[in-house]
UniProtKB/Swiss-Prot annotation:
GO terms for molecular function: enzyme inhibitor activity; pectinesterase activity. Expressed in siliques. It comes from Arabidopsis thaliana. The active site is at 409 (proton donor), 430 (nucleophile). Gene3D superfamilies: Invertase/pectin methylesterase inhibitor family protein (1.20.140.40), Single-stranded right-handed beta-helix, Pectin lyase-like (2.160.20.10). It holds the Pfam family Pectinesterase. NCBIfam families: PME_inhib (TIGR01614). Residues 1-22 form the signal peptide. The keyword Hydrolase applies. This is Probable pectinesterase/pectinesterase inhibitor 33. GO terms for cellular component: extracellular region. PROSITE patterns: PECTINESTERASE_2. Residues 280-581 are annotated as: Pectinesterase 33. The lineage of its organism: Eukaryota, Viridiplantae, Streptophyta, Embryophyta, Tracheophyta.
Length: 594
């Protein structure tokens, strides 16, 4: 009974967040390598960064060199200057590369040395795919050894994550085939995204086992860095190929729709009223729809034969359930009656025995997922640690006019390409975290009151490889204290971010920053730690408001007070997520450039 009262009170506290400070009333307008760092000559005031509760410990292995590793030049005359060893020695993980190609040779597999980088890349992806299949199979075999719920939870995540790694590598290999059909063929930007996801899945398996203190259980699999190194080699070689092309997209979203989007689907995506009037399914608690449960509707959609856009209209109400859109359930669109009317809520957390990954109120995996006009809440509360409201690993996904509320680890932007427009996001510690390539545009980011002795950290970006084309951009948005923090704003430190992984990348541009943010701006992972301070990329460009001054910001090599339009443009919708090529199909407004 007490738990029920607590749940209702906590839900009410989320709904009392300052929705009235609407983004559109705030005077808003409307994968790249990190640029060379530069130093700042102004000393910050004497202030010690706090020791906030970490989401996960940083990797204890030595990170690879942050500088680009040159892949071999293409050999146009058809000959090679050596054998596979010559090619492998050009990669960042040469020993691993040589080992697996020697192994193939010993197994009587005839390997002809490649003539071009692109051929070598396909060979690398094939080797990584073969190893991923083996790793997945080994992980599945751990199932009978799951003697408690914690092990079962970590094992289940790892099985699904390695299965997805196999899928991402297989998708990449097919897409890189010169003979692939147009609907399968991929760009090198696509490939870099999928390879980044494949590698991120491995790290997520590891961190999930640490969440529940069962890392010894899956250690035989996750301690083997070979698969991660093989994918890292793919990222490095494909990264060189990416530099030969410009993936910035500037298409006018009012004029462009991809050819695969039908005329009806275009109208459906652009018009919220049309989506409500002619959905494929309706969810309603008053029995006026097809289902009373959102998950039941999602499960029904997963069984459909054709994977075109499928609209589920969720009528107003509070839905107490966890929902999950599987990795193979593509083109799902959830449309509600508004942020304050359609509410999905649950209270899973790590302290309840869930991994961070699986604690999400809403988890989304299928490609091109869209959510509009609804709110997701994790009601676990500040005492329960990591508790996710939304987790997205959906490629080309969009969240439009969506509320996402919690405390620690509110929004898990896990992987792939994502876009958030006019969303409200609230939390305390690391409440926007993960390793997607993601842009937040015209969003309201609300910093809540943490527990006594804690500090607020807005972002914890998880880029663990210098060639991953991932990062967080907050553009034309507002970063402000929520109503529960405002009266005690001076009692708590708040930072824009801290480095979850060695190459963490966050850029904040043309955004209002209030006085809740510490003058230092950014925090180390732990108090006194030097982890990743020279290899991160934390950039600020033309922000405004009382907390926006970069005069007293940290003096790390990885911090950049950006003054160049060319540098800032690398982190826009058009560049970081190549949004001009896919966002028009969603019907959601966006600004491609600065």
């Amino acid at each position: 009974m007490l738990r029920g009262i607590f749940h209702i009170c906590l839900l009410a506290s989320f709904l009392l967040l300052p929705f009235s400070s609407a983004v559109h009333d705030s005077g808003f307008t409307g994968g790249t390598d990190a640029p060379p760092p530069w130093d700042h000559n102004v000393s910050p005031p004497p202030e010690t960064a706090p020791s906030p509760t970490p989401t996960s410990s940083p990797s204890t292995t030595s990170p690879p060199s942050p500088g680009p590793v040159a892949a071999p030049s293409p050999i146009n005359n058809g000959s090679v200057s050596g054998d596979m060893t010559w090619w492998c020695n050009k990669t960042p993980h040469a020993e691993t590369c040589n080992y697996y190609f020697r192994k193939s040779s010993q197994n009587n597999i005839n390997l002809r040395p490649p003539r071009f980088r692109s051929e070598f890349l396909r060979m690398l992806v094939k080797v990584a795919l073969d190893q991923a299949v083996i790793t997945h199979s080994q992980t599945v075999k751990f199932g009978p050894s799951c003697t408690n719920n914690q092990r079962k939870a970590a094992w289940s995540d790892c099985v699904n994550l390695f299965q997805n790694t196999v899928a991402q590598l297989n998708r990449t290999l097919k897409g890189l085939n010169p003979a692939a059909s147009s609907d399968v063929k991929c760009t090198d930007f696509d490939a870099q995204t999928w390879l980044s996801t494949a590698q991120t899945n491995i790290e997520t398996c590891r961190s999930g086992s640490e969440d529940l203190n069962v890392s010894d259980f899956v250690m035989p699999v996750i301690s083997n860095k070979n698969l991660s190194d093989l994918i890292g080699n793919c990222l490095a070689v494909n990264g060189v190929l990416m530099k030969q092309h410009d993936h910035t997209t500037t298409a006018n979203h009012k004029e462009y729709f991809p050819s695969w989007v039908s005329r009806h689907e275009r109208r459906l995506l652009v018009s919220a009223s049309l989506a409500k009037s002619s959905p494929h399914l309706v969810v309603a608690q008053d029995r006026s729809g097809h289902f009373r449960s959102i998950q039941a509707a999602i499960n029904f959609a997963a069984r459909r034969r054709f994977k075109s856009r499928f609209v589920i209209y969720v009528k107003k109400g509070v839905y107490r359930e966890n929902i999950d859109v599987g990795n193979d359930n593509h083109n799902i669109m959830l449309v509600g009656d508004g942020e304050r009317k359609t509410i999905i809520t649950s209270g899973r957390s790590v302290q309840h025995g869930y991994t961070t990954y699986n604690s999400a109120t809403g988890g989304f995996g299928g490609q091109r997922f869209v959510a509009k006009d609804m709110t997701f809440i994790n009601t676990a509360g500040p005492l329960r640690g990591q508790a996710v409201a939304v987790r997205s690993s959906s490629d080309l996904s969009v969240f439009y006019r969506v509320g996402i509320h919690g405390f620690q680890d509110t929004l898990y932007i896990h992987s792939q390409r994502q876009f958030f427009r006019e969303c409200y996001i609230s939390g305390t510690i690391d409440f926007i975290f993960g390793n997607a390539a993601v842009v937040f545009q015209n969003c309201m980011i609300l910093v809540r009151r943490p527990l006594h002795g804690q500090a607020n950290i807005i972002t914890a970006q998880g880029r663990g490889d210098p060639f991953q084309n991932t990062g967080i951009t907050i553009h034309s948005s507002r970063i402000i204290a929520a109503s529960d923090l405002k009266p005690v704003i001076r009692a708590y430190k708040t930072y824009l971010g801290r480095p979850w992984q060695a190459y963490s990348r966050v850029t904040i541009m043309k955004t209002y920053i209030d006085n809740s943010i510490s003058p230092l701006g950014w925090s180390p992972w732990l108090r006194g730690s030097n982890f990743a301070l020279n290899t991160v990329f934390y950039g600020e460009y033309k922000n405004f408001g009382p907390g926006s001054s970069t005069r007293w910001r940290v003096r790390w090599k990885g911090f950049h007070a950006i003054t160049s339009t060319a540098v800032a443009s690398r982190f826009t919708v058009g560049s970081l997520i190549a949004g001009g090529s896919w966002l028009p199909a969603t019907g959601v407004p966006f600004k491609s450039g600065l």
